[in-house]
From Swiss-Prot:
Belongs to the DTD family. Pfam families: Tyr_Deacylase. It is an enzyme of class 3 (hydrolase). Homodimer. The keyword GTP-binding does not apply. InterPro entries: Daa-tRNA_deacyls_DTD, DTD-like_sf. It is found in: Cytoplasm. One of its GO terms (molecular function) is D-tyrosyl-tRNA(Tyr) deacylase activity. A Gly-cisPro motif from one monomer fits into the active site of the other monomer to allow specific chiral rejection of L-amino acids. This is D-aminoacyl-tRNA deacylase. GO terms for cellular component: cytoplasm. Disulfide bonds: none annotated. It comes from Photorhabdus laumondii subsp. laumondii (strain DSM 15139 / CIP 105565 / TT01) (Photorhabdus luminescens subsp. laumondii). Gene3D superfamilies: D-tyrosyl-tRNA(Tyr) deacylase.
Length: 145
């Protein structure tokens, strides 16, 4: 399971001209589910995302996590993160989980984030989405479990 996380000052996701998820200061989480992923991996990745210390403390050192700053999450499914780009000029998506399994684990990941107490907004699974953000830094990390 993969999370591409971006520290943002604001982010939103639009489906068919309707804002379906929006946050201020926090993390945009692009989530890719791979074959073989399960609830245990989803829970571990959620814990890592929430606990990852990439927000500045008083000394301007990356030392605080999203929960400590009172930030929010915007979680957007993105199957392209599971692509194999090693060969040729076209990505292969054979490493991605089947859509029903990916949806199940995406929802489980979101549920775990919400249970942690962090405000969590979402995109719409398998929809054509327009994601807008203001990357703060820029600060972007690839997390994988």
């Amino acid at each position: 399971m993969i999370a591409l996380i971006q520290r943002v000052t604001q982010a939103n996701v639009v489906v068919k001209n309707e804002v379906v998820g929006e946050i201020g200061h926090g993390l945009l989480v692009l989530l890719g589910v791979e074959k073989g992923d399960d609830q245990q991996k989803a829970k571990r990745l959620c814990e890592k995302v929430i606990g990852y210390r990439i927000f500045s403390d008083e000394q301007d050192k990356m030392n605080l996590n999203v929960q400590q700053i009172g930030g929010s999450l915007l979680v957007v499914s993105q199957f392209t993160l599971a692509a194999d780009t090693q060969k040729g000029m076209r990505p292969s998506f054979s490493g991605g989980a089947a859509p029903d399994k990916a949806d199940e684990l995406y929802r489980y990941f979101v549920e775990q984030c919400r249970q942690s107490g962090v405000k969590t907004e979402i995109g719409r699974f398998a929809a054509d989405m327009k994601v807008s953000l203001t990357n703060d830094g820029p600060v972007t990390f690839w997390l994988q479990v």
